[in-house]
A protein has these predicted regions:
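Proline-centered turn/helix-capping motifs that create local helix->coil transitions or kinks
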Residues: 56-60, 160-161, 199, 204, ...
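Hydrophobic alpha-helical transmembrane segments in multi-pass membrane proteins
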Residues: 21, 75-256, 318
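Membrane-interface helix/helix-cap signal primarily in integral membrane proteins
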Residues: 1-90
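Generic alpha-helical secondary structure signal
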Residues: 16, 43, 47, 62, ...
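Short amphipathic alpha-helical coupling elements at transmembrane boundaries
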Residues: 50, 66, 81, 127, ...
Length: 318
């Protein structure tokens, strides 16, 4: 199809699709000939998605499926549009934050409970399997490659360098598929990470210098931590991705900064409580529904922010 604001041909080309054929019917020639491992993995993913749908109502179930499993198109079209306008579509995409939690948990368990080689294998395999489980989109692949490089460097007794890991991930991905360079998700993922690695520390140093002028180091440290966690991280990512948003989509969200500042602090509790409720629901649905009441208010809060800010007529500049 020819769309006014989206180059669908370029989108398909970035995924290795050169032509699209449509036939009048499909004839099934065989079954069970694919990868048993991947088939099992995707069945588990579908089972978890079904469990989320059983323990939570919509649209909260759709939001949790996006946050935990990276399942797209699980929300009504108008709510999807509100997420885009509010600059919060990224929370529905598995990214470096999810990968870092998985890698951190594996590192913690591996170092304390297992010997060197078993722990290293567990960490590397765990990150790779999780990346396959949620789907190898550009942000997931970028985050997984960086995590594998950081884990490998730590177990080799070498200091990891985030900017070097980012450059290495970019090299590996573009060497494997040069068309990634034209992918909006690839550009946004690397731009946001670059903002967090380069822009946020520079902004933080300037803020610390200003706060220290107040004469109270302890108070300055408290305000610095709060500002970094709530504002600077969001601001750095937004500034870094602004050129990509403008060139790719021809617009920028004015609501993105306040929306992210309001929503990002509750993402970790949502992931942890949501994962626990889903695991319990997988064992026994009524137990999962009880546990889901802990995460439902947080999901409802996120949706309220999206509906409020995403519904403003002045939320974007085109």
């Amino acid at each position: 199809p020819v769309l006014d604001e989206f180059d669908y041909r370029e989108y398909l080309a970035g995924r290795g699709v050169g032509s699209v054929l449509r036939g009048p019917r499909v004839v099934r020639l065989g079954a069970g000939e694919g990868s048993t491992f991947l088939r099992t993995l995707y069945r588990w993913r579908q089972a978890l998605r079904s469990t989320v749908a059983r323990i939570l109502p919509n649209p909260e179930a759709g939001l949790l499926s996006g946050i935990l499993l990276g399942v797209g198109h699980s929300l009504p079209a108008d709510l999807d549009e509100a997420f885009r306008v509010a600059g919060l579509s990224h929370i529905m995409v598995i990214s470096g934050y999810n990968i870092s939690l998985v890698a951190g948990a594996l590192l913690l368990v591996g170092r304390k409970r297992l010997n060197y080689w078993v722990a290293l294998g567990l960490c590397l395999a765990g990150v790779a399997v999780y990346a396959l489980f949620v789907g190898l989109s550009a942000p997931v692949l970028r985050a997984a490659l960086m995590a594998l490089l950081v884990i490998g460097s730590q177990y080799a007794g070498r200091r990891s360098h985030t900017l070097t890991s980012l450059a290495a991930a970019a090299f590996i991905m573009t060497a494997a598929n040069p068309l990634y360079l034209w992918s909006a998700s690839y550009q946004l993922s690397f731009a946001a990470t670059l903002g967090l690695v380069v822009v946020e520390p520079a902004m933080g140093r300037r803020l610390d210098a200003r706060l220290l002028q107040s004469g109270d180091p302890q108070r300055a440290a408290r305000w610095s931590i709060l500002a970094r966690d709530v504002l600077l991280v969001t601001l750095a990512a937004q500034l870094a991705t602004l050129p990509v948003m403008w060139t790719q989509f021809g617009e920028a969200s004015l609501a993105a900064l306040p929306a992210n500042a309001l929503v990002l602090p509750v993402q970790t509790p949502i992931m942890l409580l949501g994962a626990a409720a889903t695991a319990l629901g997988l064992l026994w649905a009524p137990l999962g529904r009880v546990a889901a009441w802990l995460v439902w208010p947080l999901l409802r809060y996120c949706l309220w922010v999206v509906e409020t800010l995403g519904g403003l007529s002045s939320a974007t500049v085109a």
